[in-house]
Structures are given as structure tokens and as C-alpha cells.
Amino acid sequence: MTNIRKTHPLLKIINSSFVDLPAPSSLSSWWNFGSLLGVCLGVQILTGLFLAMHYTSDTATAFNSVTHICRDVNYGWLLRYLHANGASMFFICLYLHVGRGLYYGSYTYSETWNIGILLLFAVMATAFMGYVLPWGQMSFWGATVITNLLSAIPYIGTDLVQWIWGGFSVDKATLTRFFAFHFLLPFIVAALVMVHLLFLHETGSNNPTGIPSDPDMIPFHPYYTIKDILGFLIMLTALSTLVLFSPDLLGDPDNYIPANPLNTPPHIKPEWYFLFAYAILRSIPNKLGGVLALVMSILILAIVPVLHVSKQRSMMFRPLSQCLFWLLVSVLFTLTWIGGQPVEHPYIIIGQTASVLYFLIILVLMPAISLIENRLLKW
């Protein structure tokens, strides 16, 4: 008799995706981050659901409702900090996942890659709107500054901003709609994840060598399920440590001050995971130029497959490209640091230099080095 997991209409889909899925035998720990992101999404949806049961999306009570969750709800403090720091873990895994794709040439699976970019935008939008909900000083002013950027769009900009605000400033209508979208978007993200996996399973996984691995495949279960579970344990240990020992380490102290439209904080900045893009935005003195640079800092990922001119897919055997890749990583760390600094000398010039380097490495230096490597290998 055939096993039920192979015949049942629903179970056989799960079986072909997570049990009998043929996977390359050489996948390293860098391939763990996809499953870790799935766990992060699950944790965020679950904790968010319970938080939404106690949260009120009204400017008069939003801040107090978060205080009530932390003080009066059973384990409310744990839910709140798991959700806030879970977002940080989500972005750490997300950036490592994208970095893995860039390093090993996974972007040549263009459908999977493009859905991934859509997912990145959706998760960033969700995180931004979530940051507004506690209605602290940084929530209010962050929302004001970032939504105001849309006014740089010619002709329709001002009307667009007022339409998003639901009035002439960030107020009750803005908070209510942000809560609605913050609740809805994770489910859209979950649907996009299904599409992401669907396209991935059409081609099969890439591997560290970048060489087709069809002759050497192993079943996903038990080999990679055990490996993924180890990843879950490490990540959940790190998240628990962060939540239980220093829950406010990655947050901003200004967000413990209730939102006040009459008092601007000295340094308005987003959460740490957006600081690199914020630094790129600030490094251009022109408003529209800054907004375009901000969007392009993420959208540039979509043109990476077009710029792939190397005869080898992975960077595993390309030391010159590896040097450039790690230079790009250090530039991103520099931008993240600059994004959290005030706009003054020498931070302005460091930010501008790092921004130019960021685009230069991806658009010019990477393809140029790939061509040089091709010549060195007489290809």
C-alpha cells in the first residue's frame, strides 16, 4: 500500500515540498535562512494577532494600550518584545538570505528572485507601519518624515501625501489605516512566500558551487529538516536572549515618550534595519533625488541578474569578486552607522562616499571584475 503522504491530495503537496523534495547534497548553513524566515513570519503573525486583541488604534489611547499590554496583560511584555525584536531577527535573516543569493548567484532564477524582491518591499512596508503603531515620538515623527517624502513626486505629490494621511497631518485617520494595513500585509507576505517556493521548486535549489547538482541529490527529510531544526534552535535562543535580557537594545528611547506634534526629537531616525537606506536618502541634497536613490537602493537588486556577465554562477571560485562582495558588505555597515548619526561633518561626506560606492560596486565594479576574471580563465 502506498504511503498516505504520497496519495492524499493535500499531504502529497506538503510531501513534495518538504519531505521527498530532491535537494543538492552540498547545501551549507547559508541555505538555512529561508526556513528561518518562515519561522520568523510565523512568530510575527502569532504574536501580532495576540497584541492586536489588546491594542487600540486611536491617537488618544494607542500609547496607553501598549503600556497596558506590557503591564496588565498576562505575558503581554513577552508578546510585545518578541514582536518588536522578532522584526529585527526577521531583517537579519532577510539580509543574510539576500546576501547569500548575491554571493552564490541564486539571482539567475529570475522568477524566484523577483518575487523575493517583492517580498522584501512588502516586509519593509509592514515593518514601517508597525513602527508607527505604539504612537511614541519616533513613531509619529518617523511616519511624518517618511510619508512626506512622497510629496517629492511631481504634480501629484502633495495630494498623494494628504490622501495617505487622511488629512493635513499624521493623525487618527493615519494611525487607523496603518494598523489595518499592518494587520493585512503579513498575510499577503505569506501568500507571496507560497509563490516564491512554487517558483523555487520549479527549478530546484542552487548550491554553493553554482554547478547543476542533478546527478547528486538527497531527500530533504531527514537531512535538511534536522539541519533546519538546529537553525531554529540557534535563532530562537538568540531571540529569547535578546527579549529576556535586553529587550530595548535595538529600539529608540524616544519611543517611550508619547507622540507630541509640537516637539520634534533632535534626531529623527527609523529602526536600525532601515538605516542604510535612510543614509542613502540623506546623502543627496535634492528631495526627489534622495527619494529615487532610496527606492533604487533596494530596486537595484532587480537588475543584478542583467549585470551577471561571469561565466561562473557562484563567487565560490572567484576571489576578485569575493573581495568586492565583502567591500559591499562593509559599505552597507558603514551606511547603517551613518544613518544613525546626526547630519553634520564628517558624517555627511562619509555617507555620500559610501552611497556612491554602494551603487558603483553593484553597477560598474562587479561586472567589470567578472569580465576580468573571464579573461584570466581564458573564457
Curated annotation (Swiss-Prot):
Q: Which residues cross the membrane?
A: 33-53, 77-98, 113-133, 178-198, 226-246, 288-308, 320-340, 347-367
Give one Pfam family, short name only. Answer: Cytochrom_B_C
**Organism domain of life:** Eukaryota
Cross-referenced InterPro entries: Cyt_b/b6_C, Cyt_b/b6_C_sf, Cyt_b/b6_N, Cytb/b6-like_sf, Cytochrome_b, Cytochrome_b_C_euk/bac, Cytochrome_b_N_euk/bac, Di-haem_cyt_TM
One GO BP on record is: mitochondrial electron transport, ubiquinol to cytochrome c
Residues holding heme b b566: H97, H196
Q: What is this protein called?
A: Cytochrome b
> Encoded by which gene?
MT-CYB
